[in-house]
Amino acid sequence: MAEITAALVKELRERTGQGMMECKKALVAAGGDIEKAIDDMRASGAIKAAKKAGNIAAEGSIAVRVEGGRGVIIEVNSQTDFLALQDDFKAFVKESIDEAFEKNLTEAAPLIASRESAREALVAKCGENVNIRRLTAVSGETVGAYLHGHRIGVLVVLKGGNDELAKHVAMHVAASNPAVVSPDQVSEELVAKEKEIFLQLNAEKIAGKPENIVENMVKGRIAKFLAEASLVEQAFIMDPEVKVGDLVKKAGAEVVSFVRYEVGEGIEKAETDFAAEVAAQVAASKQ
């Protein structure tokens, strides 16, 4: 068996990114053969990645890329926000968004498959579950993007206008989180639900009032709801005296669509019982 030197351990550590003790153990198990040690570590890394796959990943990063009338946005999840700020994770996210854009992908599945080996390697190195969650691609006359830190990303498609206007609208979407572009896109189901909520919350106030008065109150609330939910009806964050729709119209443009991603939205996060977790770790250490 070849001698396990400090230089050999260092080389393996540099090539795999694993800890010193893990590298030394791998070299001993491989009889000092560094290439075999790397293969063995990759295999165990895949096993580790499979084990980590059951852990909830609700943190992470949003990435966007826009060029030549095309835009792509992706969400990549991690278990902690700490990992999302690390260089290895950032590199994985950048490589993923670049591949998605350059291959002109329109859904996440092909990207997930293509990036699986890189994902497994990252999981093995960082010890956290990592997932590419979703991807949306858009195209149009004018496509703008805005990234707020690493947690909120927006793509906006305009008919007409320019890049600056599209970016400003994207910034507004990031801050105001509209549900739809215009009031006519709000579903009847959502309107009915809002009406029901209004009647429940104001049951005492409307009790005994004439039906036509109640109906007018409901209409007023629904009109306000539609304005709040619709991008073009919202007051522009950079100039509240102007509606977004009027701002865009004045520039001879029209909002076609938008996509807004926020890290972890819709993912149910696990409630961590730290006392139980510590107790479990102590019990495991005694075995």
Curated annotation (Swiss-Prot):
Entry GO MF terms: translation elongation factor activity
Signal sequence region: none
InterPro entries (UniProt xref): EF-Ts_dimer_sf, Transl_elong_EFTs/EF1B, Transl_elong_EFTs/EF1B_dimer, Transl_elong_Ts_CS, UBA-like_sf
Region of interest (Involved in Mg(2+) ion dislocation from EF-Tu), ranges: 80-83
Protein localization: Cytoplasm
HAMAP family, per database record: EF_Ts
Name under which the protein is recorded: Elongation factor Ts
Originating organism: Ectopseudomonas mendocina (strain ymp) (Pseudomonas mendocina)
